[in-house]
Swiss-Prot record:
The keyword Cell inner membrane does not apply. Catalyzes the formation of N(7)-methylguanine at position 46 (m7G46) in tRNA. Pathway: tRNA modification; N(7)-methylguanine-tRNA biosynthesis. This is tRNA (guanine-N(7)-)-methyltransferase. It catalyses: guanosine(46) in tRNA + S-adenosyl-L-methionine = N(7)-methylguanosine(46) in tRNA + S-adenosyl-L-homocysteine. SUPFAM superfamilies: S-adenosyl-L-methionine-dependent methyltransferases. The gene is trmB. CDD domains: AdoMet_MTases. It is an enzyme of class 2 (transferase). The keyword Transferase applies. It comes from Thermosynechococcus vestitus (strain NIES-2133 / IAM M-273 / BP-1). The active site is at D119. It comes from the Bacteria. Its EC number is 2.1.1.33.
C-alpha cells in the first residue's frame, strides 16, 4: 500500500482521552533501534507523517530523532520511509504523549523537544484534549536536563499562547525569547508550516530552556 493511500484513510483528529489510548505500550529495545543510542535525542511530539524528522535525521547524523504520533497508520508509513533511506538515527513510535512519555524515554538522553502545529481542538469542551497540559510540562521538566530546550509552533494564536503560558507557569523552564520568533530555529519546515507560510499566514513560535536544577 502506498504512503498516499495510508494517509487518506487516517482521521485528522483522534481523541487522546479515549480508553484505547490509555493502555500500556511496549517500549522498543533502543540499542536495536539506534546505531548510537547515547547520542542526544530530539523528540517531536505529534510528528504526523514524520517528514520533518526524516529530513532532520539526514542532516544531523550526530543526533537521534524520535517521532511520537497517536495515529498508528502514520507511524507505520513513516518507519517505512525511514527504512528506505536507511537512517539508523531515526524512529517513529505510536503512543500518547500524556500517558507514555516517561516509560518511552527512560534511559534515553533527551535534549530537545518540539511540539509543532498540534491539533487545536477549538471547542472549549475539547480543550482538555490538547496535547500540552500541565502534566505534560511537568513530565518534560523531569526528563530534560539543564539546558535542554523546547520549541513550540502553531499557526493558531490561541493555541500557541496557551502552550507558552503553560510552560511559563512551570518553574523549571525559562523563555529564551521575549516575543514570537520570526523564523524557525530549524533548517527544515514541517508540512503544515510550509502550507501556512505559502498562504502568507503567520506562524507563532516560542522557545524554552530547561533551567539548572
Amino acid at each position: 500500500m502506498s504512503d498516499r493511500a495510508m494517509v487518506v484513510r487516517v482521521r485528522q483528529h483522534v481523541n487522546p482521552l479515549s480508553q484505547k489510548f490509555q493502555q500500556d505500550i511496549p517500549v522498543p529495545d533502543w540499542s536495536r533501534i539506534y546505531e548510537q543510542p547515547s547520542q542526544p535525542l530530539h523528540l517531536d511530539i505529534g510528528c504526523a507523517r514524520g517528514t520533518f524528522l526524516l529530513e532532520m535525521a539526514a542532516l544531523y547524523p550526530e543526533q537521534n530523532f524520535l517521532g511520537l504520533e497517536i495515529r498508528y497508520p502514520l507511524v507505520v508509513a513513516a518507519n517505512e520511509r525511514r527504512d528506505r533511506q536507511q537512517l539508523r538515527n531515526l524512529h517513529y513510535l505510536w503512543g500518547n504523549a500524556n500517558v507514555h512519555l516517561s516509560k518511552i524515554l527512560g534511559g534515553l538522553p533527551l535534549h530537545t523537544v518540539t511540539i509543532q502545529f498540534p491539533d487545536p481542538w477549538f471547542k472549549r469542551r475539547h480543550h482538555k484534549r490538547r496535547v500540552v497540559t500541565p502534566e505534560l510540562v511537568a513530565t518534560l521538566a523531569e526528563l530534560l536536563p539543564a539546558g535542554g530546550r523546547v520549541v513550540l509552533q502553531s499557526d493558531v494564536f490561541e493555541v500557541a499562547e496557551s502552550m507558552v503560558q503553560q510552560f511559563r507557569a512551570h518553574g523549571a523552564f525559562r523563555s529564551t525569547c521575549t516575543d514570537w520568533l520570526p523564523q524557525s530555529p530549524w533548517p527544515v519546515a514541517t508540512e503544515r508550516e510550509k502550507c501556512v507560510l505559502n498562504k502568507g499566514l503567520a506562524v507563532y513560535r516560542w522557545q524554552f530552556e530547561r533551567c539548572a536544577v
